[in-house]
């Protein structure tokens, strides 16, 4: 039985502390941030702890010293002054029309107008109302004002499919934030969070002294949970997870890493786990796709299809730092949005060339994203997918029998609607790769070796499968390439059985025509 409470669905620092929920101490980084900067921006994926950080800052600036007992902030802060805090949580609304935006902003501003005895004048522009609130808070308390804006970009994301609506929303939001520069002398600290950096809102051009800490090494783990934090704080929880799943401690830790670790938000920063998925797993003792199941923007999947991009395109992407700053308002390149949304992360960084390598952070994201993308390939009958998963689990997971599994895959291909089949080699490779990812397989594509690139590799606990996929040739031709290039020799010392798998796809049949599975 769990001896502690996990803050599932609780994002407010004060509620977490007073409710005796698990809290991983980030107060030292928060203290450093507010004492090194006056204007800060942080972007992180959804459900990654941004709101918790914002409410932590609110509690700190409101001087609630009792909430920080035993935390790093207690030793770092000596004065504990109380400042007026304006906390605008933009995520409270859904912004599918201008009426929704006006209702949300009116409600947020009216709360503070009432607090400082200002007459609520809905007809006034948002910038005037926010400016009046800042001035009143400063005049009535004698202290500089703190402005915390959580999910500032929520209206922009909700209106992504409607350019005209987004333009109206952009103008309204630009107007709202404009006093943050003019009222600088009345402000102690300004902090904005979001998923994306919407450059055309003018926040980043008008507030020319704003510090974007999103990709700074020293703040890389200000949200999320590092490996050191995991093993030092949650050791007993991991042991219980291991016992419930009939694993050793090391196996459970490895499985957590495989599923939920792998996020890097700077070139040389800390490697972090997704806190939402991690807490759900430890609370339930079940490995599952918790974060991904909370929602994938359909516009991203649609955009990838429009640009004819697939899962093979999204791993091992090369990017410069400039690519991360591409304006999100007009999505020409999906990579910045995929990175900011948490579907891609930094896998490697070369400080000399300043080149980043991007890829999927972990199994949860890779499998979940392939599942979302696969609906463009899959048969309409959802039961077919379930049948394929059952075959995969029985043939490969339980019995390591590729020869028995491929006929099930062949049957699945045969049921694809003709409208979803592009008759070319790349299409069949992408579908094969995406399908196995969706099933949860540890599969890798285009793996470099000294003699070329292995088409695909599939790893199980007992075996390694070396694939070569051909189109309008034969399984013999595919097998011949594996042998000529000595692809399998790289795994001779692995300890697992190694199999060579040659597969040929037919244009006429639009599916797998022939295959060979040969042990090394």
Question: What are these model-predicted stretches?
Answer:
Residues 176-183, 336-344, 433-437, 441, ...:
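Metal-dependent nuclease catalytic cores in nucleic-acid-processing enzymes
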Residues 490, 494-520:
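Domain-level recognition of nuclease-like catalytic cores that cleave nucleotide substrates
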Residues 1-424, 439:
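Phosphate-binding site recognition
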Residues 166-171, 471-488:
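Mg2+/Mn2+-dependent nuclease catalytic core
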Residues 432, 456-471, 485:
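Conserved catalytic cores of phosphodiester-cleaving nucleases, focusing on short active-site segments
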Residues 137-141, 433-461:
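Active-site metal-binding core of divalent-cation-utilizing nuclease and nuclease-like domains
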Residues 146, 463-465, 499:
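Structural motif
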